């Protein structure tokens, strides 16, 4: 769901600025919404923030999250690309208005219990932190999954928007490089079709 083709849109005021120094590559955060991570020669967005680098999108239709991943290549001859890779990533969600009224309070309470009291996005307090993840550049897997917390899965919230915040990269003090967040989920209409058995596989 993190593609422009599926209707996702960048929330610009909740996304960090682009690194525009003379050595910048000119890639914007919109590139992360591309259908193909290989659509351009250099597909890494360089975020001006070495800490608290945020990338926020809004879905075309609210979704139930099922899986999150991040993809970053391995470069033996490009130290900057590896030191600027994300290390610690916080994930925040914004609920859809169609959720039952008490669910927002429940989400906040569970977040407080599981991730701590400081659980709202500094740029917009309507986004709630659900977990912190580590991306390991020493792992051979270039795509690494971020499992959703059990308490979040059981709550089944319908979300309208999601924010990824890189709180730490691998040592680069000038910028953070990002290639591709992968978001899997189902919409409410998808779920109705599945539950009603209207869609069958022969």
What do the predicted segments below correspond to?
Residues 61-79, 164:
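A short beta-strand element within beta-rich, extracytoplasmic domains
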Residues 1-30:
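Predominantly extracellular/luminal regions of secreted and cell-surface proteins
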Residues 42-61:
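Short beta-strands within extracellular/lumenal beta-sheet-rich domains
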Residues 17-19, 42, 133:
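Intrinsically disordered, low-complexity segments enriched in small/polar residues
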């Amino acid at each position: 769901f993190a593609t422009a083709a599926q209707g996702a849109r960048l929330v610009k005021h909740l996304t960090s600025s682009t690194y525009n120094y003379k050595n910048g590559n000119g890639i914007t955060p919109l590139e992360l919404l591309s259908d193909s991570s290989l659509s351009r020669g250099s597909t890494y967005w360089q975020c001006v923030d070495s800490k608290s680098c945020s990338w926020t999108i809004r879905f075309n239709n609210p979704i139930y999250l099922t899986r999150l991943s991040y993809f970053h290549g391995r470069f033996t001859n490009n130290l900057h690309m590896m030191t600027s890779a994300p290390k610690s990533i916080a994930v925040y969600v914004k609920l859809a208005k169609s959720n039952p009224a008490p669910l927002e309070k429940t989400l906040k309470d569970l977040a407080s219990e599981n991730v701590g009291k400081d659980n709202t996005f500094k740029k917009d307090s309507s986004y709630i932190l659900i977990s912190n993840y580590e991306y390991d550049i020493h792992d051979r897997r270039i795509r690494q999954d971020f499992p959703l917390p059990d308490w979040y899965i059981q709550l089944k919230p319908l979300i309208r928007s999601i924010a990824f915040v890189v709180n730490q990269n691998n040592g680069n003090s000038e910028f953070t490089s990002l290639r591709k967040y992968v978001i899997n989920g189902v919409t409410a209409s998808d779920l109705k079709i599945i539950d009603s058995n209207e869609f069958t596989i022969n």
